[in-house]
Amino acid sequence: MREKPEGGKGMAEHTPLMKQYFAAKAEYPDLLLFFRMGDFYELFHQDARKAARLLDITLTQRGSSGGAPIPMAGVPVHAYEGYLARLIALGESVAICEQIGDPGLAKGLVERKVVRIVTPGTITDEVLLEERRDTLLMALSRSKNCYGLAWADLAGGRFLVNEVNSEEALEAELARLEPAELLLPDEDAWPEYLQQRNGVRRRPPWLFDADSGRRKLLAFFKLHDLSGFGIENNPQATAAAGALLGYIEETQKQRLPHLTSITMETVGEAITMNAATRRHLELDTRVDGESRHTLLGVLDSTVTPMGGRLLRRWLHRPLRLREVVRQRHAAVGSMIDRDLDNKLMETFRRLGDMERILTRVALRSARPRDISTLRDSLSLLPRLRELLNASDSPRLRVLYAELGEHDSTASLLVKAVAEQPPLKLTDGGVIASEYDVELDELRKLSNNADQFLIDLETRERESSGISTLKVGYNRVHGYYIEISKGQADKAPVHYTRRQTLTNAERYITEELKAFEDKVLSARDRALVREKLLYEQLLDTVGAQLEPLKRCAAALSELDVLVCFAERAQTLDWVRPELEHTSCLHIEGGRHPVVEAVREQRFEPNDLDLHPERRMLVITGPNMGGKSTYMRQNALIVLLAYIGSYVPASRALIGPIDRIMTRIGAGDDLARGQSTFMLEMTETSYILHHATAQSLVLMDEIGRGTSTYDGLALADAVARHLAHINRCYTLFATHYFELTALADETYEGGLSGIANVHFDAVEHSERLVFMHTVKDGPANRSFGLQVAALAGLPAAAVAHARRRLAELEQRGRESHVSEITPLALDAPQQCSLFASAPSAAQEALVALHPDELTPKQALEALYRLKALL
């Protein structure tokens, strides 16, 4: 919505400054406008009110314009980045309107111009970025049967696209990538969960046109076709990429030389995990929103931020490309065998975030310490290449080549950049001495000023007889001679008063004025020269951008592989064996997170699944270890397929296309789904998508409804998974009746279902959980003992024991011991979809079998069949 001038007046009634403000604001009505005024960025009117609320800064007024007071809030220029970071974290976008030229030389109103737009998905400044997490901008396009996705990591120089054919797959990709900002065509019928996300930007639908997107991409990358990127026949991906690129160009207002290609990801390359699975497995965020005690928290020993970001990407996209994964395993093994990981890790400790530094070099926003960090990082390459030179690992040989030789660039930066440069170029002292003759001469002139001032102060004290006389300098008034008030009457007649203070007078002389002009001119010229030399360095480094980006990518991968090697040795993990045939055989498996955080020894457990044993029905007491066991096996599979070693004594793992979970309970209030509806929605997704190569975890299906409904649903789901989907399934249940599935046959053969259980023993009135998986079904649930452990009042537990005894007795008398006893005197829940009896049912009820002859019985059977 465009902001209108307040006060009910037209633009003609406003001051020139406010006219300038409203003109800039009209271009960016939906953004907060940082309007540069001297040493502050000011915000006015609605922007001021909003910023004051979000940043907890003072809301004030700046006179009036158009007959109304002007609400105003501001942040100092020297500290604006901290405020900007807070606004970006809240999902806000900011347009920065700078003063153009020197305000001191301007005649009348200073010219101002929006030079930069900062949005949650387009930030590249180090202070605004999370060090170990990608900041992604994403655009979505859609047709009837397809969604196109394009996303860019501007800070890392990556540009990727994908196409998916369902809303579920789209949601899975969003859960994986977690974009900071999402561009959508301004159309109806987008899913509600998309519209409720932070950072959603509605854009005109015509910007998402495939043909215009193709033209934009061809022009940007200077190509004749897109076949080299593999997206020539992907119109929705092309449309999304074009819309994304247009937004980036619109907000960045400059060339983007670090975006040099587009990568097409395909769903079939990776193991699919939907949003629920990522949430249940707590890969990098726990269900309660915390990031501690997650798989990433245990796994991540990377040294560099760019290695940490790559590890997070790998963790969320385990590959189905077994040869790629095997090469990672081999690289880790080679490092361990040759003790390379320790040597490489020690070297990596001196590496900087080259990936993001190179982006800032390309965007001309690199700061002096970025360049010194790049210099120090490049200087480490000879040592890294020496360590990798004799490696027998194919992947390490590739990475050795990708590192490249950058001796000339490193040598240039060593000569050109000061050992410890200042934070800002304008502070001076960035370029090293003896690099440029002209700069050295200007600095010499400036540096000699100190001795001149010492000599001048000594001479003036002697000639004036004022022992407390001082010669000094400040940025406002320049050089001065200061005399205390008590001795001001002794000031020589050739002193000209420059400034009066409370306790002193400051003067200037012709000699000091001449020196000031000479020195300040030299300093100004030195800064101008230094700026020119610095920009030349950026040009030189920028010319090597592509090989340097490949070097940074290789360093990132090496950091992750070193992390895997270190974790394998520290945590006693083993190299998994990836099989071509269907199997999931794990010996001595452990849960990586639980083992890391608990003080007691973790009890390892085995898992054995194959085509004749596809499902384990897992029974046992609550807190006995069922959920931990299921999750640990899923995490072991995931770790294996990102290239890591795994927490087990041996692991043979066949092809896996999906990891799917239905674990835990909790309402999804945002979508209006109850616990049971959420359970059924996730279960439905699994039944529709699981294949014979999928790993499925099902925890306590059916507990959200009545006992009979729950048992019936659990039975049906288990049979469907075992006989229709035929996937690897770990099925934890409190319905003991399901253990009978293992004894059934299916289509003349074994059911493919086996029983395992976790046990507990009562010892000295205490319940001890064994946490060991055993063959066969459990014989007790220990529900009351667990309730007592949880702190239920003793009276309540005692009452429950008496009630349980009564129900079990009634169950035995009624010969329905198969059904959960508690259901016997509970009212049964009616089905929402109960229907009237069918004609066949009514005919069957009317039959009296004892009164029928064999011929009549046969005729009745045919009539019933006809009614079905």
UniProtKB/Swiss-Prot annotation:
Pfam families: MutS_I, MutS_II, MutS_III, MutS_IV, MutS_V
One Gene Ontology term, aspect cellular component: cytosol
Keyword entries, A-Z: ATP-binding, DNA damage, DNA repair, DNA-binding, Nucleotide-binding
Binding site for ATP: 620-627
SMART domains per record: MUTSac, MUTSd
PROSITE patterns: DNA_MISMATCH_REPAIR_2 (PS00486)
Any one GO molecular-function label of the UniProt entry: ATP-dependent DNA damage sensor activity
SS bond list: none
PANTHER family linked to this entry: DNA MISMATCH REPAIR PROTEIN MSH1, MITOCHONDRIAL, DNA MISMATCH REPAIR PROTEIN MUTS FAMILY MEMBER
Function according to Swiss-Prot or TrEMBL: This protein is involved in the repair of mismatches in DNA. It is possible that it carries out the mismatch recognition step. This protein has a weak ATPase activity.
Family per record: Belongs to the DNA mismatch repair MutS family.
Name of the featured protein: DNA mismatch repair protein MutS
Biological source species: Xylella fastidiosa (strain 9a5c)
Source taxonomy: Bacteria, Pseudomonadati, Pseudomonadota, Gammaproteobacteria, Lysobacterales
Gene from which this protein is expressed: mutS
